[in-house]
Amino acid sequence: MDAELRYHTLLEAARHVYEGHAELTDFVPFPKDVRRQPIVPQAHPCSALFQNDDALKSVAYPDLQQAIVGAAPVAHWRETYKDTDIGADFLTRFGCYCIIGEGGPYLSSDIRLYMVYMPAHFYYPWHHHPAEEIYLVVSGSALFKKGMCADEVLLPGQTSFHKSNQPHAMATQEEPVLCLVAWRDQFETPPVWTPQMDVADGTRDAAYAEGVR
C-alpha cells in the first residue's frame, strides 16, 4: 500500500469514528475544510513498538486501529518533549503523530487530530496546554487524571475532556492504550509539564510502586 492510500484510509477511518461519536462531534464537528498538505515522514523508536504491540486488539474500532497502524511507517512522528528532562525511556516509548494539523498529512483551520500510543506499564506525567482537548480510547485502557476531578479508568469508546490549561496525566497498567485525540482553539502553544502536580499528587511514586514505569 502506497503512502497516499495509507493517508486516505486513515482520514476516512478517523472521520467515520469521529462523526459517529456524539461527545466528539459536540466538542467540535469533524471539519469540512480538510485538505491535503505535504508531509515528510519522520521515524521514531516507538513506531516499531507500536506496530508490533499484539496486546492492542480493538473490538470497538478495529478499522481505525488498523488504519493508524497502517500509517505508522509513513507518519511524521512527533518529538514534543525531546528538549525536556523527561528522560530516554519516555522519549522512546511514548508515541504520537498528527493526522490533521502540523506535521500531519491533512490540515484544517478548525481542529488538530492526533493518535497517542502508550505501552503497558507507562506513565505520562502531568502536563497542560491552552488548547482544549478530548481523548477517545480506541483500544486498551488507561487511568486518566485531571486537576480537580476524580481519577477514572477509561475503556474503548470512552472519552476524557480537558479544559484549557487544566493539568492532566495518564498511566497504563497491564495493557497498552491507543487514543484518538482532538484539540480545538489555541493550537500554536505546545504542551508543557506541570511538575508541581506530580509532587502534590504523588502520582509518579505511586505509579512506579505499582509497576508503572
Kindly label every feature range from the protein language model.
Residues 135, 159-162, 178-181:
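Active-site scaffold segments
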Residues 148-167:
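Short acidic-glycine-tyrosine-enriched beta hairpin
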Residues 7-8, 173-213:
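Double-stranded beta-helix
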Residues 102-104, 122-123, 166-168:
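Short beta-turn/strand-loop junction motif enriched in small, turn-promoting residues
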Residues 2-109, 207-210:
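A short, N-terminal "cap"/entry segment at the start of jelly-roll beta-barrel domains
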Residues 110, 115-121, 128-144:
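Short, conserved beta-strand element in jelly-roll/cupin
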Residues 129, 147-149, 173, 182:
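Surface loops and adjacent helix of pleckstrin homology
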